[in-house]
Amino acid sequence: MFMIFMKYLQPSERLGVFLAAVQSMRAPSPHSTELAAHMVDVLAAETDFHSGQVLHIVWAIYRSLPSVRAALALQSLDRALLLLASKRPRETVASLLQCSLTCTSVAVTMWRAMVSEPPATERVLHELLRILMNQSGCKTSTSTKHHLRIQALAAARPLHEILLLPTSRGEAKAIFPQLFLALLFQVSFTTELKLQEVQVFWEKHQQDLLTPVRSTVQALKALLRSVGLGSQVLAIEAQGVWAALLSAESHLWGVQVVAREMKELPRSLRTTIIHQLVELLRTEASSWQTVAMVILSKLLECTELGDELDCVVSLFASYLRSPCLGMQSLVLRAILGLTERPATARQTLVLLLSITEQLQAADSDTRAVALPMLSTMLRLLEGRTLSLAALELASKLPALFGDDSSTVRLLSICLFLDTLGFVEGSQEKLQQVAHRSLLPLSFHLHDQDESVAEASREALLGVARFLRWRQLAHLAETLRAGRSASACWPGGAAQQRSTWPRACPTCRACRSPCSGRL
């Protein structure tokens, strides 16, 4: 009878009948409940509700469900939600998130109904993943309807509930790399929330004690367990990392540890995650860049790397110029790890020029990472390529001799001396570089750091020999020998230094570079 009646209903009228049927399920009458359940079943199966109608339906079910007692009616509503999730996953998921940002017990019941069969589970998980990944760059708004950042906060709660279901494991495993990254990014996002956004999230839900970042961490743990990584969850717990992820000050360290534990994943999964990270880092700038690079650098510590390394190296070339605070140092540390392994070191050589170019603008910490790496890279080169690279690097290094960091001063002076022996041909250019290094080196002959002072004297001697400058070489040897004997000098090192200007014509030698050549 109802099927005949339904043929004459307009699409807009069908929505009204559906809503009335849902509301009538609250009545205790078995007859009315049975009829209402039949109407809901038929309308859900035969009608393609548009997005605005889906929102009304989901709200109606959410409001009515606590008052529905009949098993027949509850089963009918479950089937309706399953059909809506299958036909209109985007609208259904968004509507239920609007109904309950903090995923109340009623919402949990509805989410479970929506993922009760694998095809719908896959669609719902993909939609939640899309929402998690769409939060970056959205402006703050007090409207949850159009605010993707707020929806992203809400998405972690139902995701946690869904991942606890045994029936979701197959679908979760299929998109594990994407879900894993989305949740780690969400951890970073939730530790940087604006006060207004937190207030919007908690409006009318202040009794719920599970904060947004805790929801995300719970979902991440559930995801790892659902794909058989329970031992990794325990290992992370033992290091106090789950707690660290909750804090803005320590969450990046927590991300590092979680990523490091993922090195035990099968190679196919690791490769997929690396490719996913590279793709994300190639897109427009986002708040995820630092977190993504932290994860990538840890995964690159794996002993087995294939074609994905070429993609990563090309990505590093652009990120060495990133203005993002700390990004240069992060990239350089990842490259340094690759240069220290014979299987991957040579693939990093294409970055040598880019690293050299960044030395001048880099901070001391970044330089301290870059200089040992450049030394390693030079030793992997041969012939003319080595000579040209060494000459270019030698021209940049004297500017680093005066760095505030004694480590950088020491590394740059030692590396400069090494480059003199790597250059073949181009003697005129190298001589110009060597002459320009004399004054910066002389400033550090008595550096407050004894290691730097000793390196400066060795470098000065090396430059003098390279230039075949006899008087300067003699002076450098005297300085080196005198320093070694300073402990035995009457009156100590200070007394010894006070005699050098009268014994050694340093200034005259430096002012007359053409005299006394070997």
Spans of model-derived segments:
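Short amphipathic alpha-helical segments embedded in low-complexity Lys/Glu-rich regions
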Residues: 98, 112, 148, 172-180, ...
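Alpha-helical repeat/alpha-solenoid scaffolds of the HEAT/ARM/MIF4G superfamily
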Residues: 161-259, 269, 274, 469-474
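Extended HEAT/HEAT-like alpha-solenoid repeat tracts in very large eukaryotic scaffold/adaptor proteins
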Residues: 1, 5, 32-39, 77, ...
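Long internal repeat-built scaffold domains in very large eukaryotic proteins
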Residues: 226, 463-469, 485, 492-518
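Hydrophobic residues within the alpha-helices of tandem HEAT/HEAT-like
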Residues: 2-6, 21, 25, 36-47, ...
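Intrinsically disordered, low-complexity regions enriched in proline, serine, glycine
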Residues: 52, 93, 122-124, 140-141, ...
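Short coil/turn segments at helix-helix junctions and helix-capping linkers
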Residues: 8-9, 23-34, 45-49, 60-72, ...
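HEAT/HEAT-like alpha-solenoid repeats
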Residues: 9-25, 49-65, 87-106, 128-137, ...
